[in-house]
Each structure stands twice: as C-alpha cells, then as structure tokens.
Regions:
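Basic/polar N-terminal segments that are highly enriched at the extreme N-terminus
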Residues: 1-3, 110
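A structure-centric feature marking long, well-folded core domains of fungal metabolic enzymes
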Residues: 3, 10, 22, 33, ...
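Active-site-flanking beta-strand signature of metal-NTP-handling nucleotidyl enzymes
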Residues: 7-15, 57-59
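Short, surface-exposed ligand-recognition loops at beta-strand->loop->(often short) alpha-helix junctions
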Residues: 15-27
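Short amphipathic alpha-helical/adjacent loop interface patches that line ligand
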Residues: 28, 32
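An amphipathic, aromatic/His-enriched active-site/gating alpha helix that lines ligand/cofactor pockets
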Residues: 33-46, 61-97
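A short beta-turn/loop motif at secondary-structure boundaries
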Residues: 47-53
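Short, low-order "capping/linker" segments at domain edges
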Residues: 98-110
C-alpha cells in the first residue's frame, strides 16, 4: 500500500466552550463540506465522534496544498472565527480515551 503524495489525513479534537455544544456540532456538519467546496479537502470519508467529556474528534483529509491555502482563504477564516467562539482545539493526548490501547468514542451522525 502506498501513501498518496501531498494529501494529509488529520485527527483534530474540539473541546466545546460552556453552552456551545450545539454550535460545535453544527460547525462539525459544515466544516469538511465547506473545505471541499473550496477544493481544500478530499472526498475521503469524514469520521466524527465524541469523547466522554463532550470533545468532538474529527478525522478528515486535506487536499494537496489545502492546509496552506486555507490560511489565506476568507471563507475558511470566517469559519475558523466561529470555531474559536465555540470551542478550543486540544491535543488528542488530553482526552482520557487516548490513554487506552483502543481509544473508543461515540460516533456522531453528520
């Protein structure tokens, strides 16, 4: 099996701010479709799940050069402002599940 050059699979954890859980779930629904509409993410299936503490974990794949282009894309920057109001991005290692050999999360339906 060979990796596809230039594409990057990422796992990111979003810890909702108090009272912002619903906003974060809505952002999770919008996130990758918006990135795809801007040609920044691939069609690789998205996985979204939730940790016991309410943190949302998302797995998606950036298109080649997508990460760099996202940082200057006004549509993405506006979305990231909404994320900043709704959550904090935290290291995966901060989730209690991450200390288990088989980290288990509750799947989210997007």
């Amino acid at each position: 099996m060979q990796a596809q050059s230039g594409q990057t699979l990422v796992i990111v954890a979003y810890k909702p701010k108090p009272g912002k859980e619903a906003d974060l779930l809505q952002l999770t629904r919008e996130h990758v479709p918006l990135l795809r509409s801007e040609n920044l993410a691939t069609d690789h299936p998205v996985t979204a799940c939730q940790a016991k503490d309410g943190t949302v974990v998302e797995v998606f794949e950036w298109a080649e050069g997508g990460i760099e282009r996202a940082h200057t894309n006004p549509v993405v920057l506006k979305l990231w402002e909404r994320y900043a109001a709704a959550c904090d991005i935290v290291p995966l290692a901060s989730l209690s599940e991450a200390s288990n050999m088989f980290a288990s999360f509750t799947p989210l339906k997007l």
